[in-house]
Amino acid sequence: MENQLAKSIEERTFQYQDSLPPLPVPSLEESLKKYLESVKPFANEDEYKKTEEIVQKFQDGVGKTLHQKLLERAKGKRNWLEEWWLNVAYLDVRIPSQLNVNFVGPSPHFEHYWPAREGTQLERGSILLWHNLNYWQLLRREKLPVHKSGNTPLDMNQFRMLFSTCKVPGITRDSIMNYFKTESEGHCPTHIAVLCRGRAFVFDVLHDGCLITPPELLRQLTYIYQKCWNEPVGPSIAALTSEERTRWAKAREYLIGLDPENLTLLEKIQSSLFVYSIEDTSPHATPENFSQVFEMLLGGDPAVRWGDKSYNLISFANGIFGCSCDHAPYDAMLMVNIAHYVDEKLLETEGRWKGSEKVRDIPLPEELAFTVDEKILNDVYQAKAQHLKAASDLQIAASTFTSFGKKLTKKEALHPDTFIQLALQLAYYRLHGRPGCCYETAMTRYFYHGRTETVRSCTVEAVRWCQSMQDPSASLLERQQKMLDAFAKHNKMMRDCSHGKGFDRHLLGLLLIAKEEGLPVPELFEDPLFSRSGGGGNFVLSTSLVGYLRIQGVVVPMVHNGYGFFYHIRDDRFVVTCSSWRSCLETDAEKLVEMIFHAFHDMIHLMNTAHL
């Protein structure tokens, strides 16, 4: 990172924003052709024929009109999708977002200098906070290197949403408050919020214009910790953020109505750089087994998470750390970036603070004392109960495959991401006896304010290969050829999607134009094959590559009978995390992971033996 920083001295983090190309609108014909191809694995002959007719009718009729209107919209906006995506994918959603939408991940420090150890929470926390604050300062000064693909700069806009950002609940639609500014843009908030035992505190991280040091941060954390443990538990207002969105919006309005000062306190949390959570539980965590960390990050005490914050940094009693982040303002690659930066710093310093132990005379943290009544306390009680009940239904399997990793797949000329995606397809096919419609995230950051596109990994080629693997009469050579066809197809789709040639966001745009124009929903979107193939947020497999660093994350499944599957890739291993719901009797995250590891071996075996 330091070398990168040195190299990028002349480049400012956000300097290329204005020169990025606008998000393109793909060709209607191409999108519909790709869509038809994607429904094939889920249709019999008659169903496919019917869908083909529906698509043709759409292409020649209303689809053409909607596409023209979409092109018109795109003329006036550098990103025709941005506002729509934010609303439809996040802000209009009414289910509790802390459990169902947020992404979480453990900090990887337990793999090296910070194994789980009781009594380390506050000291480690102060060091971790300091590195996070240094990253914030780099961003404020625009010294964070611009992300690039080769020499092409990628969109950096989401980095504005990492700090001092919060979702605010609304009756029908939430909104996002963002208070971050770069130094050249002016003043921005400089305080963090700390949640501990149902109470909330804030303190400034600058003193005399400089960041406060780890010993000073430790003084602040110790003050809060001792106060909370020596006095009764607080009203746990934060738990309300884990509620159903409209219920939380009404509770928030009521809270503000009780006392206008409550709004001032809420705004202090909203505008804080991030929330630091002090948990009093200790999840089991070793490099081989850290499922419990994920369970506690997603389903832990809602009284010490502000579910709507773009960044909750969570500390556990045994010195294990992690994060819970609202997904609305940004995608997980941001968290991967800051988490990796912090982890590298901890490795450099052997997990210790080596600077001055001096503690200056800095103001003590300020407690945010909300005015509450019986109704609010009852709302808090209900919120906690619903969150903990829903979270107890979650099954998480986090596991590390150590037989081989990227090094071997590259040697076999197989793209490691595609390798894992196809292993997942085979595992699902073996476990459930049918193809599983699958969403893999592709990034579209080549374009202005680009975020994501859907790669539909369950291709005709992938299914043919899965079938051959289960067919005793198929030769090794035939299986290998089918697998390589599936690889080629997936790699092409990923390239297309990253370069603005996907079709899922395009179809969403056409549907939203119809809605805005007050037109009936086109038949294409009512067709059973639309949802059976994953359309309308119905993907049974919701997946994402977290990257090639030491960082791991997870999100809950998109549908009740589905899985969330997230993974990162290293030279010598694949680290995977799978989520499912216990109340769904047909899914089992642990079994699926077992089958995936089995598939990894089968695939490499195929490459090694097929040419003998």
Curated annotation (Swiss-Prot):
GO cellular component terms, semicolon-separated: peroxisome
Annotated CoA binding sites: 406, 410-417
Q: In which tissues is it expressed?
A: Liver.
Keyword hit for Cell division: no
Q: What is the effect of changing residue 553 to M?
A: Lowers activity towards medium and long chain fatty acids. Increases activity towards short chain fatty acids
Report the SS bond pairs.
Answer: none
Matching entries from InterPro entries are given as:
Carn_acyl_trans (IPR000542), Carn_acyl_trans_N (IPR042572), CAT-like_dom_sf (IPR023213), Cho/carn_acyl_trans (IPR039551), Cho/carn_acyl_trans_2 (IPR042231)
Q: What is its main location?
A: other
PTM-bearing positions, type N6-acetyllysine: 406
Q: Which UniProt keywords apply?
A: Acetylation, Acyltransferase, Fatty acid metabolism, Lipid metabolism, Peroxisome, Transferase, Transport
Biological process per Gene Ontology, one example term? carnitine metabolic process
Question: Pfam families given for it?
Answer: Carn_acyltransf
Q: Where in the cell is it found?
A: Peroxisome
- Provide the positions where the record notes the PTM N-acetylmethionine: 1
Which reaction is the catalytic activity of this chain?
Answer: octanoyl-CoA + (R)-carnitine = O-octanoyl-(R)-carnitine + CoA; 4,8-dimethylnonanoyl-CoA + (R)-carnitine = O-4,8-dimethylnonanoyl-(R)-carnitine + CoA
Task: Identify which residues the record assigns to the active site.
Answer: 327 (proton acceptor)
Q: Which PANTHER family match?
A: CARNITINE O-ACYLTRANSFERASE, PEROXISOMAL CARNITINE O-OCTANOYLTRANSFERASE
Q: What is this protein called?
A: Peroxisomal carnitine O-octanoyltransferase
Q: Which organism is it from?
A: Rattus norvegicus (Rat)
